Amino acid sequence: MLLKLYNTKTKSLSDIKNFSDTKVYACGPTVYNYAHIGNLRTYIFEDLLIKSLRLLKYNVNYAMNITDIGHLTGDFDEGEDKVVKAARERGLTVYEISRFFTEAFFDDCAKLNIVYPDKVLVASEYIASMIEVVKVLEQNGFTYFVNGNVYFDTSRFNGYGQMAGINLNNFGRSSVSRVEIDLSKKNKSDFVLWFTNSKFKDQEMKWDSPWGFGYPSWHLECAAMNLDYFKSTLDIHLGGVDHVGVHHINEIAIAECYLNKMWCDMFVHGEFLIMEDEKMSKSNNNFITIKDLESDGFSPLDFRYFCLTAHYRTQLKFTFSNLRACKIARENMLNKLTFFYSSLSQFDMALLNKNCENIESVSENKYYNNFLEKIAFDLSIPQALALLWDIVKDDDLSALLKLLLAFKFDEVLSLGLKEGVLREIERDRVNIDDTMHSLIEERRLAKLRKDFKRADEIREYFRSKGFVLIDTEEGTKVKRG
């Protein structure tokens, strides 16, 4: 089954046809602060895509970058380096800041069940590749050098800005009020490839180059690391919708002028998480971290569930009341699945522990096929989540099949369902003493002679002690209430 995604380049749904070596790249974090939940919504969307591709039998090679240098406080070459600014404010070196927040980012990802990339590309480790890309662009006439910096000449690239629908004659007009005008540029849309000391005197991370001692731009970093790792073309480039109008069109310009051919088939963008009708932003100081949510009593997986309730191309408004509703829904789901699990026979438990794909009832089940169709059609995750609830409520499905399907769906949804159920089962595990054994046997005999009053009395006795009796084909099980 082919997966279709909305391609920002073509403004239409496109099939992903490369099954054998699907090359996917995601713009990772600039590691100068904790990732906020707006950032993490994008990484959850990207995680859902990677897992959907793999469930649909694509052989995915997934890379993500870490920007530890050269990302300015503005996208138009203005401001100062975010990492340098954070290091100065905290009294640390840029290397200490980068290392600390890289670890913090992947810690948050682990809490959210976000898959670790096949390759993490750290910008400061690819300086030689970046310099090589600029050399080739320079040789081919796409750059100019002025006032100590190497610029990309956008007028030399006919396709510049097409993905964003940019008219070069009007470029930057809507942003003039907030952009520091760089008089060194030939065109407003031109951007720096390599900075030297002439631009920012306090830049700590610098390298020697043919153009002087300096550092690369954010746009050059992503393009050069891609070209180094994947060697040539790319199937899917992922990122937030805020990257469409500057960063990603600059990446395209660099890569296509370097390769002299089309670089990436498909660009896919996730929409904003918003608060009070504004996107969440560190620069606006209106952001919430995973640690903040945990301090308020939420599991990171409550937030993941919340993100699953909206399509990735739809803005999602964050409120704590909505998050609480998702927390309740996720806990209800776990409670229902735990109940199903506790009712399984030993034989069914053995089946459950096998790989779901080896059980015919799953692969041929209408719910499973419907789930594949949902994720394959532009990641229709809210509808896929609704199918999970349909399974739980379907009285025609056995407890075993419900669990098999739920756990299979969770290979993509990643709500920690199996782990959560097993944790609840272990928590509810009861060591049954002789008195309990005697009462359970007495209740069994009472039911056989149709003395339901006595059977109910024994059930109520257990309940008064904080236990619940569950009748199964193999006898009565006891769990904590």
UniProtKB/Swiss-Prot annotation:
Q: Where is the signal peptide?
A: none
Which family does the entry's similarity section mention? Belongs to the class-I aminoacyl-tRNA synthetase family.
Which residues does the record give as ATP binding sites?
A: K282
GO aspect biological process, one term: cysteinyl-tRNA aminoacylation
Q: Indicate which residues form the motif 'HIGH' region.
A: 29-39
The record's comment on cofactor binding reads:
Binds 1 zinc ion per subunit.
Q: Which reaction does it catalyse?
A: tRNA(Cys) + L-cysteine + ATP = L-cysteinyl-tRNA(Cys) + AMP + diphosphate
Record: residues binding Zn(2+): C27, C222, H247, E251
Q: Which cysteines are joined by disulfide bonds?
A: none
Q: What class of enzyme is it?
A: ligase
Q: What is this protein called?
A: Cysteine--tRNA ligase
Q: How does it assemble?
A: Monomer.
* Chief location: cytoplasm
PANTHER family named in the record: CYSTEINE--TRNA LIGASE, CYTOPLASMIC, CYSTEINYL-TRNA SYNTHETASE
Q: Which NCBIfam families match?
A: cysS, PRK14534.1
Single annotated GO MF: ATP binding
The record's Gene Ontology cellular component field reads:
cytosol
Where would I look for the motif 'KMSKS' region in this sequence? 279-283
Q: What is the superkingdom listed in this entry's lineage? A: Bacteria
According to its UniProt record, what is one Pfam family this protein matches? tRNA-synt_1e
Q: What are its cofactors?
A: Zn(2+)
Organism from which the protein derives: Borrelia hermsii (strain HS1 / DAH)
Entry EC no(s): 6.1.1.16
